[in-house]
Amino acid sequence: MSNQIKTNSPRAWLLAARPKTLTGAAVPVMIGLSLAFADGGWQRFLVVPALLCLLFAFVMQIDANFVNDYFDFKKGDDDEHRLGPRRACAQGWVTSQGMVVAIAITTVLAGLIGLPLIFWGGWEMVLVGVCCVVFCFLYTTHLSRWGMGDLLVLLFFGLVPVCATYYIQRHTLTTEVLLSSLACGMVVDTLLMVNNYRDREGDRRHGKRTLVVLIGEKASELLYLSLGLAACLIGLVFLFPGRYCTFILPFIYLALHGHTYRQMKTIKQGKALNQILGLTARNIFIYGLLFTIGVLLDVAFIK
């Protein structure tokens, strides 16, 4: 495949951007926006900042993908033993110099997209944006090698995007929003779990102490299942105000998640786990969709 792709061509950059990962970036924003809409209605829903939040999430995800591609290549992590999808720099689809320029462009672009959000969310949005950029780099260069990748996913694919999106719309935070952000981070972390589960032997070889390497195969399998289960159980918070659909619908996701878990346990190792990665990404998007639909249905029924 690498021989058919011209270096630095549009197709090469499309592959480097990893568009399939954008669903994971969209889910936290979807959840934050749906909760804001439920609590404020159409009259108070701000369309422009909603679109900016979504666009910022997309560009930051692409930026993170570029950073990951470049630094893993420089550290020699993407060698001939790699089990996951091939990476642009390692395959020669994109030059390392070109990737550095792309990282700079996407970082600046994310900043320009996020800057207007100060108008709606206040200057604290600057801190949010800076943290997103800083930890985007720290994840690949240091923290993912020290078993902190899962914590960062909980923060930057859960707490930060869900709460920031909601806060921009409503200028406050609620218990339901905070718990929903935690649930979202748990669901998205299943993707990192299966990724590191697949790469556990290679990571051990390269000295990467991911959570999977630290706790072992069996515990990692159980944690993968437990993350999805815990996320759905957190939805109990919606029963008390009578938001039954928001609680019930995500259990459809849990059924899919449980089936994917059984497949993962059967496959155990090798490139065949890439299909579990794809199924997990699908499940994450379905969770976000079900949660959003549940929130909107509750708005209709409660009114």
What residue spans do the PLM features occupy?
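Multi-pass membrane catalytic core of lipid/isoprenoid biosynthesis enzymes
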Residues: 80-120, 208-243, 281-287
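Functional transmembrane core segments of multi-pass inner-membrane proteins
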Residues: 153-200, 204-206, 218-221
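Extended hydrophobic alpha-helices typical of membrane-associated regions
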Residues: 240-300
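Membrane-embedded alpha-helical segments that form the functional core of polytopic membrane enzymes
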Residues: 30, 41-67, 126-137, 176-194
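Topogenic membrane-insertion module of multi-pass membrane proteins
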Residues: 1-52, 56, 146-150
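Acidic (Asp/Glu-rich) catalytic motifs at the cytosolic membrane interface
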Residues: 59-83, 190-212
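Intramembrane alpha-helical segments
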Residues: 85-172
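Small-residue-rich segments of transmembrane alpha-helices in multi-pass membrane proteins
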Residues: 26-32, 152-166, 184, 213-217, ...
